């Protein structure tokens, strides 16, 4: 994101300016609005650890609008979400695809939401390997293990039987917010903040 708006607040000492994401962090809001990669994962993990250190008893709100991305980077975020003492509430705005959908489902049960026009998409992990036949075989076996791990976690998070998850993730599987709620990826649809 190249343009980041600034917020100016009045304090008893004068004016104070923040970039918008720092201001949202003060309200315990983290935003993923890009692909999941090492850089975005490092930022999100650091923000979650910071918010836990600030107050381990207050929820973190994690807004997701992501096409997905790296499985390893996504697992870094997922594991941190499970590790911190704070409940992490997830909210999909726009699209949560691939690893974005996985992270949406990883929120605290009962606190996973989507806005009404959100789209959610799950599928199996993508991969590619080059090199000697033995190396390609090693990579193929690894991606199959990764697929099985992702499917098992999605089954646990959604309550869907593992064989249904395996069938549905064989190809791109798109859902509306209503369908994602019925599937168990989210718990409710947010129309207006209360």
Swiss-Prot record:
Belongs to the peptidase S14 family. It is found in: Cytoplasm. HAMAP family: ClpP (MF_00444). The keyword Protease applies. GO terms for molecular function: ATP-dependent peptidase activity; ATPase binding; serine-type endopeptidase activity. PANTHER family: ATP-DEPENDENT CLP PROTEASE PROTEOLYTIC SUBUNIT (PTHR10381:SF70). GO terms for biological process: protein quality control for misfolded or incompletely synthesized proteins. The keyword Nucleus does not apply. The active site is at residues 98, 123. Cleaves peptides in various proteins in a process that requires ATP hydrolysis. Has a chymotrypsin-like activity. Plays a major role in the degradation of misfolded proteins. Its EC number is 3.4.21.92. This is ATP-dependent Clp protease proteolytic subunit.
């Amino acid at each position: 994101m190249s343009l980041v708006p600034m917020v100016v607040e009045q304090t008893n000492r004068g004016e104070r300016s923040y970039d918008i994401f720092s201001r949202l962090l003060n309200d315990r809001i983290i935003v993923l609005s890009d692909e999941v990669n090492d850089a975005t994962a490092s930022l999100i993990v650091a923000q979650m650890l910071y918010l836990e250190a600030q107050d381990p008893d207050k929820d973190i709100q994690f807004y997701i609008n992501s096409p997905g991305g790296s499985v390893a980077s996504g697992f870094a975020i997922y594991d941190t979400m499970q590790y911190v003492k704070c409940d992490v509430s997830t909210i999909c705005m726009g699209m949560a695809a691939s690893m974005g959908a996985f992270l949406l489902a990883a929120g605290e049960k009962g606190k996973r939401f989507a806005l009404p026009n959100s789209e959610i998409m799950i599928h199996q992990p993508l991969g590619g390997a080059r090199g000697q036949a033995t190396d390609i075989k090693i990579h193929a076996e690894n991606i199959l293990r990764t697929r099985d791990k992702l499917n098992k976690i999605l089954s646990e998070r959604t309550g869907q039987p593992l064989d249904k998850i395996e069938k549905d993730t064989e190809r791109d599987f798109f859902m509306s917010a209503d369908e994602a709620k019925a599937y168990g990826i989210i718990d409710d649809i947010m129309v207006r903040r209360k």
